[in-house]
Amino acid sequence: MLEMNSGMFLQGRPAMGSWVTYGLGSENQNLPGFVVLHGSMPRGGKPIWAPGFLPKKFQPTAINGTNPIGNLTRRKSMDDQHQRAQLDILRAMNRVHGEPRSLERDLAARIESFELAYRMQTAAPEAMDVNQESKATQQAYGVDQKETQLVGRQCIMARRLIERGVRFVQLYAGTNGGGGGVADVPWDGHNDIGANHRIAAKSVDQPIGALLSDLKSRGMLEDTLVVWGGEFGRTSDAQSGKGRDHNPNAFTMWMAGGGIKGGAHYGASDEFGYKAVENRVSVNDLHATILHLLGIDHERLTYFFNGRDFRLTDVAGKVINEILCLLYTSDLPTNCVV
């Protein structure tokens, strides 16, 4: 999971969402530029989407799909005027505290987070309120069904956030099943891949289909890149009877909208589905292609740290031009749902 997000399998490198917001900034100053939507906490926890050595203002706001944002509502005894006065006093104190500590980036980011939280009190609840959608829309996403409710809500939230200028939204579904119930069953089919994948696939199939249709009907799909995938595939040989083991040597991801050529496919595995043998794509290639579609040259998006320039694709990565509608030079999509 770390490698799919940051290009490296070790902690400490920035996640792709942080790189994108570092490169493109945010379109809505009242909402975060990078949002993570999850049910159960994915294996690896928060480090998999951390900003690494990038300034902490590029870290995501992580939101539980069943309990969106905690501690966002101010106390009933405090009105907007009094809260603004309180924050102004806090800002003045922080300024005095921060002047001799101007090189402490984490401190500056922490101070900035208070202001963002204040602005989010108005913008975030409205953006996250799935109940503002029509009954027909909620049913299309599967919000009314137990199996699809969690991912359906996440997909609606993602569309609403993108609609309001959030630059990068990342959804996690079927991560570990730790208390998530049927709606968050993991894709880890070691014992019975048939039963496991039927449930896991059902939880995402209707919601993601509805998201694509919804984005297209609203004229948003051409400006929004949607990326769907995991971190590895499964072996073709049996494990524990009906199960399948992990297989990082060959697996599938798909992309839609945002300059992707519909119906195109790239790469192939051997006859056993065990190993990629034709037009192999690395994680660096995937990241280079995503950044290209968002208008970013992956070789020029760099950050100086520990004596050298770092980038998401490190020293590798090539754009997969064969899956693009055209070789973009301008008028690029600027939002991403992963």
Regions picked out by a protein language model, each given a short descriptive name:
Residues 1-327:
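Ligand-binding pockets and gating/stacking loops
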Residues 328-334:
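Conserved small/polar residues in nucleotide/adenosyl-binding loops
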